[in-house]
C-alpha cells in the first residue's frame, strides 16, 4: 500500500475503535490503564535499549542538550510514565457526566452530557513520554488516538506504542484504538491531516515550524500547543528573596521545558537594588543574560538583547532581561511578545496583581509563584495532553475534560412543538 492508503486505513480503524471505546465502563478503562502501566515497567529494559538507539543517533546528528534531555528515557522516567497512567486511572471519568440540567415551561427537561470527542490525532517531536501520556488521557476520555512522533524518537515511540497496544488488546479493546503513524517524513503528516472524515481533532506539540506546518495544511480542527515564551515581572513591591527563589526555579530547574522562564521584566524603581543581585546569582549558575540598555547598565556582564530575543523560546540557560517603566509597560511587553502560555508577577500589591491577572493575554497567569506550575499535575488536573495556546476549544493545560465535548439530552413526556 502507498503511504496515503496506509494512513487512511489507520484512521478508519481508529474511527471504528472509537465507537467501542465510547461504550466502555469506567471500570474497564481503569483496568486497561493499570495493565498498560504494569507492562511499561515490565518492559523497561527493552524500552531503555530502544531509547539508546535514538539517543545515539541524536548525538551523531548534533541535537541540543535540551532536545536530548527531552528524548532520554531511564528507569526513573519509565516508572514516572507508568505512575502517570495509574494517576489517570484514579481520576474521575468525565464521560457521561451531566453538567447542566434545566426545566422548560413545557416541562421538557434539558441537559448537557459529556461525551468523547472521537478520534484525536497528536503530532509531536522528541518526547517519547507523550506517547504514553496521550494514550492514557485519550483512552480514559473514551477517544481513540493516532500518534505521530518525530524521527528523533522513532525507536522509543514504536516500542512504547507496541507495549501499550498489546496490553490494550489483551483486555479486548481493538488495536485501532491506539495507532502510531510509522512514517517520519512530512508526507505521513500531510496524509494524516487529510483524514477529516475519521479524525475529529489534531493536537500538534512541538516547535514553531511544526505548529505552522500543521495549521496551514490541516483539514481538521487544530488545537495549537505553541512555544512557551514565559515571563516573570518583578514589580516595585516585590519581596526580593521571594523573587530570587522563583526566578532561579523557573529558569534553571529544567530550562528545556515549555513552562521555563524566558524573559525577565523588572520595574525601574527596584532595578538598581535587584538587578546586580539577581544577575550575580544567575551568572554563577551559568545562565547567559541578554539585556536591554538599562539592564546592562546595572549588569555589564549581560549581552545586548535584540528584538528577536523578546520572541525567543530558548529552552537553554539563556534569559532575556528588560527594565520597564511601570506595570503598564510590563503588560504591554507580554501581550506583544508572549506566546499565550504562562506569565508571573512578583508583587505585594493585591490590586496590581489582580490587574495583571485581568489584562495579561495568556492561558495561565501566576501571582508570586514559579511559571513551572503551569502543568496539569501541578494544577490538580492529573496528567495533561499539553498546554493549549488556542482559545478554542480549550486554553491552558488540557486534562481529561478538555478531551470531551457535550451533547444536549432532552427528556419529554409526549410534548410536541406547537
Curated annotation (Swiss-Prot):
Disulfide bonds: none
Pathway: Amino-acid biosynthesis; L-proline biosynthesis; L-glutamate 5-semialdehyde from L-glutamate: step 2/2
Catalytic activity: L-glutamate 5-semialdehyde + phosphate + NADP(+) = L-glutamyl 5-phosphate + NADPH + H(+)
Domain of life: Bacteria
Localization: Cytoplasm
Cross-referenced HAMAP family: ProA (MF_00412)
Family: Belongs to the gamma-glutamyl phosphate reductase family.
One annotated Gene Ontology cellular component of this protein: cytoplasm
Record keywords, A-Z: Amino-acid biosynthesis, Cytoplasm, NADP, Oxidoreductase, Proline biosynthesis
InterPro entries registered for this protein in UniProt: Ald_DH/histidinol_DH, Ald_DH_C, Ald_DH_N, Aldehyde_DH_dom, G-glutamylP_reductase_CS, Glu-5-SA_DH, GPR_dom
Organism from which the protein derives: Pelobacter propionicus (strain DSM 2379 / NBRC 103807 / OttBd1)
Record-given protein name: Gamma-glutamyl phosphate reductase
Enzyme Commission number(s) of this protein: 1.2.1.41
Chloroplast among keywords: no
Record GO biological process: L-proline biosynthetic process
Function: Catalyzes the NADPH-dependent reduction of L-glutamate 5-phosphate into L-glutamate 5-semialdehyde and phosphate. The product spontaneously undergoes cyclization to form 1-pyrroline-5-carboxylate.
Keyword Amino-acid biosynthesis found: yes
Principal place of residence: cytoplasm
NCBIfam families listed in its UniProt record: PRK00197.1, proA
GO MF: glutamate-5-semialdehyde dehydrogenase activity; NADP binding
